[in-house]
Every structure is written in structure tokens, then in C-alpha cells.
Design a protein with these regions (language model features):
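Accessory, solvent-exposed terminal regions and/or long lumenal/extracellular loops of proteins
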Residues: 15, 109-311
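Single conserved position on a long alpha-helix in the C-terminal lobe of the eukaryotic protein kinase
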Residues: 39-41, 45-103
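Surface-exposed, glycine/proline- and aromatic-rich loop segments on solvent-exposed faces
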Residues: 1-43, 95-117, 121, 125
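Solvent-exposed coil/turn segments that connect beta secondary-structure elements
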Residues: 13, 89-92, 132
């Protein structure tokens, strides 16, 4: 999101085949299914337990002609809350000039930031919130791209470094759903080992310390929160209902989650959630690769005995 403006800028390797606005419940359901949970067990316990955007092209569709200068407007449309364009151009400067004229507020060095993407043949997706939308949490945008091998795709997190305030960090959660296991290709990654967990009381553990250590690489690293297989779209429908029942899905729309699962037909695939916290000097585009990865349940158990201490 650009500073001082409710807008999104995203380089894409191909033109999207679908742009739509989805419900925040989709992210709530994914979080409910994959978020790490540490359960502290006590001696008396008998039970053993104590990252879319979419709507079909609208308001102009494809082929809207050339914009100002060297910028070609390839798609133009809208969702309930957003107006968006997909543009191509010859230089980062021509695209930033066009976006500025179109009302997007960009950092001073954004032309240089976009130049490598333009040189690599990327298109630029830009969306801004309609002036009629009330203030509050922004709805997720869902983009569908033509299928491609994970190794040829990267997520442009490096662009976020140009709008991150000095000294600040950015927390990222990424959901990877694919036929086969997909993991980061240019960052180290690991799951937190349940054997390293220590309960220091009936309610506290060293989980946060383990997480901080796991992402402590000077160049950045990711933690695997969950890696589940086989994934079934019914799992998301069940998860959103569980979240709502437990007060974690206020305002979420189960019907929107069902609609999302009908657009994502990868039942039986592997769902992996990775998470990190990075500074500007650690942010770079996340490349993906296929790899072997053990299944990892997001729920971990650690015993605590007040008399003997944690075991």
C-alpha cells in the first residue's frame, strides 16, 4: 500500500486472467487452519492437550489503448471497493509518471524501484480504493495468473522496502498451495522443532524466542508454521465456521469462503504457510522452488510440571 494513499502497486509476470475482490474471511479461514498454536499440557491432563484479489474484469476489460507517453493500459476495471489498471511500459519513469498523473502517491525513488521489473518484462497492476468506500480494513484483492512452474515465479516483496519507514520491519505471512511442495528459493527456512519448546509456566513458553532465533539470519529467513497434505477445500469451509464459533471471524462471510474454494481447484495439494519479519535491507523478491519438506502440524505440545519444572 502506498504511503498517504489507499492504493496497491504490484509487478506481475503476466496479465491477470481474473481480478476480483474477496472477503477477509478467506484469510481468516487460512489463518485458522494453519496458524501456530502451542498447547501446554499439565500432569493432570487426560486429553494430552492443555497470504487475494478478484471479480471478473469490469468497467472496460482488456485492450484500453495507450496511455500517456510510453505506457500502454492493458486492462482497466473495478470491484466493489477498488478501481484498477494493468499497465505496461518501456521504463520505470514513464510508468511512475503515468501512475502519479492517475492519482497514485509514490515514494520519490519508485521509478528506480520499478525499472528492474519493467526491464524483465513485467506488467504493473495498480489498484486504488474508491472515494465512496468508508474508512476501515481493506478488502483483500484476488489476482489469478496463467499457470506456470513455481521456479519461474517470484513474489515482489522487495518493492515494499521502498515504502518501509527507516528502522521499521514488515511482518509477512505467505500461503503456498501447489501440487507438490513449494518453499522459498532464496531465503533459508525451517519449522520450529517441538522438541525445543519449553514451558516456563502454565501459560508461557519460549516459542517467541525460538521464532526470533529462526528468523535471525542477517539476510532474512522464514519459519514454516504449517505444511499440510492433502489439502481439501472443505477444510477452509470448516475453518471459517470454527473461527466464527470461537469469536475470531467477526464479520467474515462463509459464503465468500465457499466461493473462493470453487475458484481454487487444487484439492489434494500441499498447503504450506511461511512467516517472517524483515527489515528494508532484508526485503527482496521471494523466489519459489519445489523441494522435499516434512509435513508439519501447526499445533505443538509441551508439558509443564510445576513441581519438576518444564520437561
Amino acid at each position: 500500500r502506498c504511503p498517504s494513499s489507499p492504493a496497491f502497486i504490484l509487478p506481475l509476470p503476466a496479465q491477470p486472467t481474473l481480478v476480483t475482490q474477496t472477503d477477509a474471511g478467506v484469510l481468516v479461514a487460512l489463518d485458522e487452519l494453519t496458524a501456530p498454536e502451542v498447547v501446554i499440557t499439565l500432569p493432570s491432563d487426560d486429553s494430552g492437550g492443555g497470504g487475494f484479489c478478484g471479480a471478473a474484469l469490469d468497467g472496460g476489460g482488456i485492450g484500453n489503448g495507450r496511455g500517456d507517453g510510453d505506457v500502454m493500459v492493458l486492462q482497466r476495471g473495478s470491484t466493489a471497493d477498488y478501481e484498477y489498471v494493468v499497465v505496461g511500459g518501456d521504463t520505470g519513469e514513464s510508468i511512475t509518471d503515468w501512475l502519479t498523473m492517475a492519482g497514485y502517491v509514490l515514494p520519490a525513488d519508485y521509478a528506480d524501484a520499478l525499472t528492474p521489473y519493467i526491464a524483465g518484462g513485467n506488467f504493473i497492476f495498480a489498484a486504488k480504493v474508491k472515494s465512496t468506500v468508508a474508512e476501515g480494513a481493506l478488502a483483500p484483492i484476488e489476482l489469478h495468473l496463467p499457470a506456470q512452474d513455481p521456479g519461474s515465479f517470484s513474489i515482489p516483496y522487495g518493492l515494499a522496502a521502498h515504502s518501509l519507514p527507516p528502522g521499521e520491519t514488515l511482518s509477512l505471512t505467505t500461503y503456498l498451495l501447489a501440487s507438490g511442495t513449494v518453499v522459498p528459493g532464496n531465503y533459508p527456512f525451517a519449522a520450529i522443532d517441538q522438541a525445543d519448546l519449553i514451558a516456563t509456566s502454565e501459560t508461557e513458553t519460549n516459542y517467541q524466542e525460538l521464532y526470533n532465533n529462526a528468523i535471525g539470519d542477517p539476510d532474512g529467513a522464514w519459519v514454516v508454521d504449517a505444511s499440510l497434505e492433502p489439502f481439501a477445500t472443505a477444510d477452509l469451509n470448516s475453518s471459517i465456521n470454527t473461527a466464527i464459533e470461537n469469536g475470531r471471524g467477526t464479520g467474515a462471510d462463509p459464503a465468500a469462503v465457499t466461493a473462493f474454494t470453487e475458484r481454487v481447484t487444487l484439492s489434494g495439494a500441499r498447503l504450506t504457510r511461511i512467516r517472517t519479519t524483515l527489515g528494508a535491507d532484508q526485503l527482496r523478491d521471494l523466489t519459489l522452488t519445489k523441494a522435499t519438506l516434512d509435513l508439519h502440524d501447526p499445533t505443538m505440545y509441551v508439558p509443564y510440571d510445576a513441581d519438576a519444572g518444564s520437561t
